[in-house]
Amino acid sequence: MALYQIRQYQERDHKHVVDLFSSGIKEHIPAAFRYTLLLPKTLLFLFAAPLTIVLASGSWLLAVVCIFFLLLLLRFLAGQPFKEYVAMCLQTDMADITKSYLNSHGSFWVAESGGQVVGIVAALPVKESPSGRKQLQLFHLSVSSQCRGQGIAKALVRTVLQFARDQGYTDVVLETSIIQQGAMTLYEAMGFQRTGKNLENSIIKWLIGFFFISFHVCFPFCSGT
Protein backbone atom coordinates (compact mmCIF):
# COMPACT_ATOMS: atom_id res chain seq x y z
CA MET A 1 0.00 0.00 0.00
CA ALA A 2 1.37 3.41 -0.98
CA LEU A 3 2.46 5.63 1.91
CA TYR A 4 1.42 8.72 -0.02
CA GLN A 5 -1.55 10.04 -1.95
CA ILE A 6 -1.66 12.26 -5.00
CA ARG A 7 -4.30 14.96 -5.12
CA GLN A 8 -4.96 18.28 -6.80
CA TYR A 9 -3.30 21.39 -5.41
CA GLN A 10 -5.17 23.46 -2.81
CA GLU A 11 -4.44 27.02 -1.70
CA ARG A 12 -3.30 25.85 1.72
CA ASP A 13 -0.44 23.98 0.01
CA HIS A 14 1.17 27.09 -1.46
CA LYS A 15 4.01 27.69 1.01
CA HIS A 16 4.98 24.01 1.13
CA VAL A 17 4.83 23.75 -2.67
CA VAL A 18 6.99 26.83 -3.18
CA ASP A 19 9.54 25.65 -0.61
CA LEU A 20 9.74 22.20 -2.22
CA PHE A 21 10.03 23.68 -5.70
CA SER A 22 12.79 26.13 -4.70
CA SER A 23 14.88 23.60 -2.78
CA GLY A 24 14.42 21.00 -5.52
CA ILE A 25 15.82 23.33 -8.16
CA LYS A 26 18.68 24.74 -6.09
CA GLU A 27 19.88 21.30 -5.01
CA HIS A 28 21.24 20.84 -8.54
CA ILE A 29 23.80 23.65 -8.13
CA PRO A 30 26.65 21.44 -6.76
CA ALA A 31 26.13 18.97 -9.64
CA ALA A 32 26.14 21.87 -12.10
CA PHE A 33 29.46 23.08 -10.66
CA ARG A 34 31.02 19.62 -11.03
CA TYR A 35 29.65 19.35 -14.57
CA THR A 36 31.15 22.73 -15.47
CA LEU A 37 34.53 21.83 -13.98
CA LEU A 38 34.81 18.76 -16.21
CA LEU A 39 34.07 20.57 -19.47
CA PRO A 40 37.13 20.57 -21.78
CA LYS A 41 36.98 24.36 -22.21
CA THR A 42 36.91 24.81 -18.42
CA LEU A 43 39.87 22.50 -17.85
CA LEU A 44 41.81 24.27 -20.58
CA PHE A 45 41.07 27.68 -19.08
CA LEU A 46 41.97 26.57 -15.54
CA PHE A 47 45.30 25.33 -16.89
CA ALA A 48 46.08 28.20 -19.25
CA ALA A 49 45.22 31.15 -17.01
CA PRO A 50 47.55 30.27 -14.09
CA LEU A 51 50.28 29.18 -16.51
CA THR A 52 50.09 32.55 -18.24
CA ILE A 53 50.42 34.30 -14.88
CA VAL A 54 53.47 32.21 -13.94
CA LEU A 55 55.15 32.90 -17.28
CA ALA A 56 54.37 36.61 -17.05
CA SER A 57 55.15 37.22 -13.37
CA GLY A 58 57.10 34.20 -12.19
CA SER A 59 54.82 33.98 -9.15
CA TRP A 60 53.33 30.61 -8.29
CA LEU A 61 51.48 32.17 -5.36
CA LEU A 62 49.68 34.52 -7.73
CA ALA A 63 48.80 31.54 -9.93
CA VAL A 64 47.30 29.67 -6.95
CA VAL A 65 45.28 32.74 -5.98
CA CYS A 66 44.10 32.97 -9.59
CA ILE A 67 42.88 29.35 -9.56
CA PHE A 68 41.07 29.95 -6.26
CA PHE A 69 39.19 32.96 -7.59
CA LEU A 70 38.41 31.22 -10.88
CA LEU A 71 36.84 28.34 -8.96
CA LEU A 72 34.76 30.78 -6.92
CA LEU A 73 33.64 32.47 -10.13
CA LEU A 74 32.69 29.15 -11.73
CA ARG A 75 30.75 28.14 -8.61
CA PHE A 76 28.83 31.41 -8.79
CA LEU A 77 28.14 31.10 -12.52
CA ALA A 78 27.03 27.46 -12.21
CA GLY A 79 24.35 28.47 -9.74
CA GLN A 80 22.98 31.42 -11.69
CA PRO A 81 20.64 29.57 -14.13
CA PHE A 82 18.95 27.75 -11.26
CA LYS A 83 18.61 30.82 -9.04
CA GLU A 84 17.29 32.89 -11.94
CA TYR A 85 14.77 30.20 -12.85
CA VAL A 86 13.44 30.01 -9.29
CA ALA A 87 13.17 33.80 -9.06
CA MET A 88 11.34 33.98 -12.41
CA CYS A 89 8.85 31.24 -11.50
CA LEU A 90 8.11 32.73 -8.09
CA GLN A 91 7.14 35.96 -9.83
CA THR A 92 5.09 34.29 -12.56
CA ASP A 93 3.31 30.92 -12.56
CA MET A 94 4.20 29.87 -9.00
CA ALA A 95 2.96 33.16 -7.55
CA ASP A 96 -0.65 32.14 -8.19
CA ILE A 97 -0.82 28.43 -8.92
CA THR A 98 -4.60 28.30 -9.08
CA LYS A 99 -4.71 31.01 -11.73
CA SER A 100 -1.70 29.73 -13.67
CA TYR A 101 -2.70 26.07 -13.82
CA LEU A 102 -6.12 25.14 -12.46
CA ASN A 103 -7.87 28.03 -14.20
CA SER A 104 -5.89 27.67 -17.44
CA HIS A 105 -7.05 24.23 -18.65
CA GLY A 106 -4.13 22.59 -16.91
CA SER A 107 -3.64 21.11 -13.46
CA PHE A 108 -1.25 20.99 -10.52
CA TRP A 109 -0.88 17.96 -8.26
CA VAL A 110 0.83 17.33 -4.96
CA ALA A 111 1.95 14.09 -3.38
CA GLU A 112 1.12 14.06 0.32
CA SER A 113 2.59 11.79 2.98
CA GLY A 114 1.99 12.08 6.70
CA GLY A 115 0.11 15.32 6.15
CA GLN A 116 3.10 16.90 4.38
CA VAL A 117 3.57 17.85 0.73
CA VAL A 118 6.45 15.68 -0.49
CA GLY A 119 6.09 15.93 -4.27
CA ILE A 120 4.71 18.20 -6.97
CA VAL A 121 4.03 18.21 -10.70
CA ALA A 122 2.10 20.49 -13.04
CA ALA A 123 0.80 20.49 -16.61
CA LEU A 124 -0.42 23.07 -19.11
CA PRO A 125 -1.60 22.89 -22.72
CA VAL A 126 1.03 23.86 -25.30
CA LYS A 127 -0.25 27.04 -26.92
CA GLU A 128 1.33 26.44 -30.32
CA SER A 129 1.18 22.70 -30.89
CA PRO A 130 2.23 21.31 -34.29
CA SER A 131 -0.56 20.93 -36.81
CA GLY A 132 -2.78 17.97 -36.01
CA ARG A 133 -1.37 17.55 -32.51
CA LYS A 134 -2.79 18.48 -29.11
CA GLN A 135 0.11 18.68 -26.69
CA LEU A 136 0.34 18.95 -22.92
CA GLN A 137 3.55 20.15 -21.25
CA LEU A 138 4.76 18.77 -17.93
CA PHE A 139 6.32 21.23 -15.47
CA HIS A 140 7.95 21.33 -12.04
CA LEU A 141 8.33 17.64 -11.21
CA SER A 142 9.98 17.53 -7.80
CA VAL A 143 10.09 15.13 -4.84
CA SER A 144 11.41 15.84 -1.36
CA SER A 145 14.91 14.42 -0.87
CA GLN A 146 13.66 12.59 2.24
CA CYS A 147 10.98 10.70 0.32
CA ARG A 148 12.79 9.52 -2.78
CA GLY A 149 12.99 5.88 -3.76
CA GLN A 150 9.30 5.27 -3.04
CA GLY A 151 8.06 5.67 -6.62
CA ILE A 152 6.54 9.10 -5.98
CA ALA A 153 8.11 10.77 -9.02
CA LYS A 154 6.94 7.97 -11.30
CA ALA A 155 3.44 8.16 -9.82
CA LEU A 156 3.33 11.92 -10.42
CA VAL A 157 4.36 11.46 -14.05
CA ARG A 158 1.71 8.76 -14.45
CA THR A 159 -0.85 11.23 -13.10
CA VAL A 160 0.08 13.72 -15.82
CA LEU A 161 -0.06 11.03 -18.50
CA GLN A 162 -3.49 9.87 -17.36
CA PHE A 163 -4.75 13.46 -17.29
CA ALA A 164 -3.47 13.90 -20.85
CA ARG A 165 -5.25 10.74 -22.03
CA ASP A 166 -8.49 11.72 -20.33
CA GLN A 167 -8.40 15.19 -21.91
CA GLY A 168 -7.68 13.88 -25.40
CA TYR A 169 -4.09 15.05 -25.78
CA THR A 170 -1.88 13.38 -28.38
CA ASP A 171 1.49 14.10 -26.74
CA VAL A 172 3.09 15.05 -23.46
CA VAL A 173 6.23 17.17 -23.78
CA LEU A 174 8.74 18.56 -21.31
CA GLU A 175 12.18 20.08 -20.93
CA THR A 176 14.83 19.33 -18.33
CA SER A 177 18.39 20.54 -17.91
CA ILE A 178 21.46 18.51 -18.86
CA ILE A 179 22.37 18.51 -15.16
CA GLN A 180 19.29 16.52 -14.10
CA GLN A 181 20.46 13.05 -15.07
CA GLY A 182 18.10 11.31 -12.65
CA ALA A 183 15.09 13.02 -14.18
CA MET A 184 16.20 12.10 -17.70
CA THR A 185 16.60 8.46 -16.71
CA LEU A 186 13.10 8.47 -15.22
CA TYR A 187 11.48 10.02 -18.29
CA GLU A 188 13.17 7.61 -20.67
CA ALA A 189 12.15 4.64 -18.50
CA MET A 190 8.54 5.81 -18.81
CA GLY A 191 8.58 5.95 -22.59
CA PHE A 192 9.66 9.53 -23.25
CA GLN A 193 12.08 10.13 -26.11
CA ARG A 194 14.63 12.89 -26.53
CA THR A 195 13.68 15.29 -29.29
CA GLY A 196 16.43 17.91 -29.20
CA LYS A 197 18.43 20.51 -27.32
CA ASN A 198 17.40 24.02 -26.39
CA LEU A 199 20.47 26.26 -26.38
CA GLU A 200 19.51 29.60 -24.88
CA ASN A 201 21.16 32.82 -25.99
CA SER A 202 23.08 33.45 -22.78
CA ILE A 203 26.82 33.98 -22.32
CA ILE A 204 26.73 32.57 -18.80
CA LYS A 205 24.93 29.40 -19.89
CA TRP A 206 27.38 28.97 -22.76
CA LEU A 207 30.34 29.34 -20.40
CA ILE A 208 29.06 26.67 -18.04
CA GLY A 209 27.76 24.39 -20.81
CA PHE A 210 24.16 24.64 -19.63
CA PHE A 211 21.29 23.68 -21.91
CA PHE A 212 17.88 22.02 -21.85
CA ILE A 213 16.92 18.68 -23.38
CA SER A 214 13.41 18.26 -24.80
CA PHE A 215 11.40 15.06 -24.35
CA HIS A 216 8.05 13.86 -25.61
CA VAL A 217 5.83 10.82 -25.51
CA CYS A 218 3.01 10.12 -27.95
CA PHE A 219 -0.16 8.19 -27.19
CA PRO A 220 -1.22 5.42 -27.26
CA PHE A 221 2.37 4.31 -26.56
CA CYS A 222 3.62 4.78 -23.06
CA SER A 223 5.60 2.36 -20.90
CA GLY A 224 5.93 2.27 -17.16
CA THR A 225 2.23 3.05 -16.55
From Swiss-Prot:
Transferase is among the record's keywords: yes
SUPFAM superfamilies: Acyl-CoA N-acyltransferases (Nat)
Signal peptide per UniProt: none
Domain of life the protein comes from: Eukaryota
GO biological process: determination of left/right symmetry; gastrulation with mouth forming second; heart development
Keywords for this protein: Acyltransferase, Developmental protein, Gastrulation, Membrane, Transferase, Transmembrane, Transmembrane helix
PROSITE patterns noted in UniProt: GNAT
UniProt-recorded name of the protein: Probable N-acetyltransferase family 8 member 5
Gene source species: Rattus norvegicus
Primary gene name: Nat8f5
